[in-house]
């Protein structure tokens, strides 16, 4: 934990490792502003962050993903935390979304890790990620986000940690080789 905390203290850029096949995300309880800065470097997008934007996020991808998938993942993270990315000229403003007031507050500092909101990028191998969306959606909480990124056949899931763990188990069972 101390090494990770030190790493995050220096720069979140180390938490996103570039690879020939793409980028592997590994943010654990990271400041959302630092995550935004790193996503900006990866995607070459410029963000203006509203002073009200704060909180800690966990984003993990099991395999390297494209920079487009990284941005799609970041948008899901924002949405699940009641935030939105609003393009403004060459910049993208990160602000509280209008829906944020109606959403229940997320426990950023919850003592129960299963209650923390996490985002997972899940590589699907044997079935279409898009086909999994209608199967998984009814199993998710109302605040959760689920998106398929067909170009690299990945699912992006944002929900409470306990639900994401359960969904990953279900996905693993569905995504079996038919051989």
Predicted regions and their residues:
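Bacterial N-terminal signal peptides that target proteins for export
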Residues: 1-5
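Sec-dependent N-terminal signal peptides of Gram-negative outer-membrane/periplasmic proteins
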Residues: 7-179
């Amino acid at each position: 934990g101390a090494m990770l905390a030190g790493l995050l203290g220096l720069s979140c850029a180390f938490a996103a490792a570039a690879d020939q096949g793409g980028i592997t995300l590994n943010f654990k309880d990271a400041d959302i502003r630092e995550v935004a800065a790193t996503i900006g470097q990866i995607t070459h997008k410029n963000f203006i962050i509203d002073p009200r934007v704060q909180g800690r996020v966990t984003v993990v991808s099991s395999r390297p993903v494209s920079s487009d998938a990284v941005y799609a993942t970041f948008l899901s993270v924002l949405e699940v935390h009641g935030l939105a990315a609003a393009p403004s000229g060459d910049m993208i403003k990160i602000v509280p979304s209008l829906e944020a007031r109606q959403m229940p507050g997320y426990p950023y500092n919850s003592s129960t890790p299963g209650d923390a909101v996490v985002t997972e990028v899940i590589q699907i191998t044997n079935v279409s990620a898009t086909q999994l969306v209608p199967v998984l959606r009814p199993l998710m909480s109302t605040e959760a986000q689920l998106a398929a990124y067909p170009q690299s056949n990945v699912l992006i899931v944002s929900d409470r940690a306990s639900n994401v763990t359960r969904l990953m188990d279900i996905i693993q069972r569905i995504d079996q080789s038919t051989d």
